[in-house]
């Protein structure tokens, strides 16, 4: 079974993820990104999709033109887990050239 993060674990892990915010009413985190154009946004999503498939852990996301909104939560645990934190760190690295959220 996948271990859901405790409140203290969640707080500690999120200190290292300053671009992520809590989703109101859910045990989930969200990040909004904006890229130069659709090609950059889609390229970013492709890199994340490959990693997510390797992890067997898939984000909820929404894309319009150059904007990508991502929500992470582990459905099997009904909340945040280490898998979400690992994927968030990968996303941060992949999005290093992105502009602040839209």
From Swiss-Prot:
UniProt-recorded Gene Ontology molecular function terms: 4-alpha-hydroxytetrahydrobiopterin dehydratase activity
Entries under PANTHER family matching the protein: PTERIN-4-ALPHA-CARBINOLAMINE DEHYDRATASE
Family: Belongs to the pterin-4-alpha-carbinolamine dehydratase family.
Record-linked InterPro entries: PCD_sf (IPR036428), Pterin_deHydtase (IPR001533)
Catalytic activity annotation: (4aS,6R)-4a-hydroxy-L-erythro-5,6,7,8-tetrahydrobiopterin = (6R)-L-erythro-6,7-dihydrobiopterin + H2O
UniProt name for this protein: Putative pterin-4-alpha-carbinolamine dehydratase
Keywords: Lyase
Pfam families: Pterin_4a (PF01329)
A single BP term in Gene Ontology: tetrahydrobiopterin biosynthetic process
Keyword DNA-binding: no
Domain of life, source organism: Bacteria
